[in-house]
Regions:
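Gly/Ser/Thr-enriched, mixed-charge loops and adjacent short helices
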Residues: 2-130
């Protein structure tokens, strides 16, 4: 599982900055963690967030402008047998897309196993087989994705940046006239 690891998030729900992650990594070096003893009175409590998937789905859908419709749009969603296996299909289907889902049967060992953004071939083939207009393949922890068009052609991060830049330019939002990726 070399492509996956632990992610820490701050109280705002976003990933920690690199400096904070570096400090945490230093604590995890052999011999360091064992020497740290926490005062039981200072340790917080963990609790289960009821309906976390539902709440996250609502948040993700709120990021899509209401004017953007997915009704009847045929998509392939490859969840890499990982973190996106429940949420991604739910979000796209609730937005109205007609989805075909692959990589949504994690067993604890098959994450990224010849599937997902690091192995987009199955997504590309499925797009062609079902006649989808596009496909999205996430990596195991769902912090990256790669896309393909209706012909199975890969749309990578540079392509996405170019598409976003052209959109921003058309709306007068690209202030400097350039994008650095």
């Amino acid at each position: 599982y070399s492509d996956n690891g632990i992610k820490f998030f701050g109280p705002d729900g976003f990933k920690l900055d690199d400096a904070t992650e570096d400090e945490i990594e230093k604590l995890l070096l052999p011999g360091t963690l064992e020497s740290l003893k926490a005062d039981p009175g200072l340790i917080g409590k963990s609790y289960r967030i009821e309906d976390a998937i539902g709440r996250y789905t609502v948040f993700l859908k709120s990021c899509i402008p209401a004017s953007k419709k997915f009704e009847g749009v045929k998509l392939v969603v490859d969840a890499a047998n990982g973190a996106a296996h429940k949420v991604a299909p739910l979000v796209f289907s609730e937005l109205g897309a007609d989805i075909t889902v692959i990589g949504n049967k994690p067993d604890g060992k098959n994450i990224n196993d010849n599937i997902g953004s690091t192995h987009p071939g199955q997504m590309q083939r499925t797009v062609l087989e079902v006649g989808a207009v596009a496909g999205v393949a996430y990596d195991g922890d769902a912090d990256r994705a790669i896309f393909c068009d209706e012909k199975g052609g890969i749309v990578d991060g540079d392509d996405v940046l170019a598409i976003l830049a052209l959109d921003m330019k058309s709306r007068g939002k690209l202030t400097k006239g350039a994008v650095v990726g």
